Amino acid sequence: MSQDTGLFSIKRPRESLAHFSALPQPSSALKRTSSIGAFGNPPTAQHTRMSLLNSASRPQQPNFQRSSSGGAFGADAGLSSVRRSVSSNIFHGASAGRQSYAPGSFSSNPASQNLQRRSSVFSRPSAGVGGAMGHQSFFTQVPNAAGVPRDPRPLRDRSFQARIGQELLEYLTHNNFELEMKHTLGQNTLRSPTQKDFNYIFQWLYHRIDPGYRFQKSMDAEVPPILKQLRYPYEKGITKSQIAAVGGQNWPTFLGMLHWLMQLAQMMDRFIMGEYDEACAEAGVDVSGDRIIFRFLTGAYHDWLQGGEDEDDETAGQRLVPHIEMMAQEFERGNEKYVQEVQALEAENRALRDQIEEMEKSAPDMAKLDKHFRILEDDKRKFEDYNQNVQGKIEKYENRIKFLEDELQKTEADLQAAEDERAGLQSSVDRQGITIQDIDRMNTERDRLQKILDDTMGRLEETHSRVMEKEKEASEKLEALEEVVKAYNTLGYQTSLIPSSAVNAKGQDYELSLNVNESNFSASQIGSAPSRISPEGDRLLAEPFTGYHPAHLLSLDLRGTVRSSLQTLRKDINERRKRAADDDLDRRNLLDNIKEAMDEKRSEVEALEHRRRAAEEEFERTKEITTTQKLASDAQIEKMEKELAKMRATMSESVQLMEQREMNTNIEYEQLTLRANALREELHTNVESMLNDVIRFKVHVQKGLEDYEGFVVDEVEQELGGDMVPADDIPPEEEL
């Protein structure tokens, strides 16, 4: 008696069953309201149980609404409000062989009455006033495409018909069709069947899919809705007239339909046997939990239906305890592999964490590695720049080497020409016959000219050294100018002045470049002997003997157009900077105001925090008082529970006495019913006798009136000399 009577109570919503199963409900679980729905209220938690003696038909079934996966047995599914609207028949054992005197009894078979008194979830009630959910199934309805689809199967092929017919016949034979339907099948049944054969085969196949369905109408009315619910692809090509005559040319179509039903039933059998569980697991769908819950629900509901009308909630809850324990054990067995996997993963995780810790301890300092990496990246970038510069110099030196080789070849050619000229001159001198005095005089003249040449070469060397210094200085200036131009272009890119499509360029080209001649001048171009001027100085010359003019060296007019444009841009930028500074000042003022508001709010929060602490202290005091009161209430409740247990024990004895009185009252009621029937028959006999007497009296009076009317007519004819007086002119007294 101390058990919680609310545990899995039948009369309260079962919130613990919500969202446990993804299995669709069978069509027999989608209950339709029977004809009793027109005379009474639906069985909900607010309505009490009704006895079979007061019902006009079999008890109304709970209306289980179709639900999607994940919410098959929620609080709204109708299971929580199921009420058993029948009473236990205490006279079933004593009077099992006679009909009940209850009004509205619809069956003389006690077994059928017992089945209809407590119907299972796997049965379907007859369609009545409330049968709005007729032909419901767990196959969802989907809109079909327009037109009649064409069946791609070769149903007109004799060999194909023989093959699927043999498969269907073997399936029927192996699954006890003849024993269940009490109908014999022959070898030619599926070649030239009768209408009865088709009806039995179709009903049996559909019962394999939905065992609780009951065929109540003709087949031409039952088959189309069933095919539509099963989503048979070619149900539009089957008409009611064809269903009424399945033989002849229509039989291949119906044979294909029966074969499709057989395949569907086989698929459901395989699903029930768990052949698709591995495929579901590979797809990431775990159906083991759904199977456990479905077995629990079916078993618990079946045991609950076995209870009597007077069974209380505690006993009903006790019926569910074994099923709950079994479900818990199955879940524990199913979760063992997951627990093992979790343990293995945890061990692997710990091992990996240990490895990470060891690697972190043995690894060098990441900051040093990052610093070293940045240094290497910087060195890499410098080496790449150096390689690019060296590559450019290599190309330039290759061009110079090629130029010098050409000059060397030309010089060798000139030397050879000079040697030839000297030999010619020597031979000419020999032919002329010059004397020794002439030779001395020419030598003296040569020495004088050589001395003059040496002085000239000295002055040339001095001039060349001064030229080299000037060339070096000019080269440094040129390189500095190139750096300045490069810096200018870089700043132009940064300030969106370069290229001409930039924002601040406004279509003008501000990119600066040097108009420097890259070619070298040879000695032949200069028109003299090989010059001692270095090749680096060739870039400083616009022409062989002319340098660059400052105005022509740069590609843009810096002091004119560029300077004015830059001043305009500078002015614009200063204005924008000024506006940005003003905006920044406004935002700083706004930020200061926000900080002041935050300080005020912070003070308010501190005040609220003080109030919260005071409220918490008040709450603690109230909690202590409430705890004390709760302890006193618990003691009072325990005392009342003990008194309630005593009252229940007393009530059990009273219930037994009331049951005995109910049995006596039922016996007296049946005796009174028999006496009332006998009295009714006696009264019917008396009423019939009285009616016969009244009828005879009426006939006698009518005959007397007719005789009197004839007598009056004769008397009137005699008095008036044979004239006929109309019956309408006879006075009322004479008529009577």
Swiss-Prot record:
Residues 28-47, 53-72, 98-128 are annotated as: Disordered. GO terms for biological process: cell division; mitotic sister chromatid biorientation. One of its GO terms (cellular component) is nucleus. It holds the Pfam family NDC80_loop. Gene3D superfamilies: 1.20.5.170, Ncd80 complex, Ncd80 subunit. Keywords: Cell cycle, Cell division, Centromere, Chromosome, Coiled coil, Kinetochore, Mitosis, Nucleus. The gene is ndc80. InterPro entries: Kinetochore_Ndc80 (IPR005550), Ndc80_CH (IPR055260), Ndc80_sf (IPR038273). It is found in: Nucleus; Chromosome, Centromere, Kinetochore. Residues 325-492, 586-688 form a coiled coil. Residues 53-66, 105-123 have a biased composition (Polar residues). Component of the NDC80 complex, which consists of ndc80, nuf2, spc24 and spc25. This is Probable kinetochore protein ndc80.
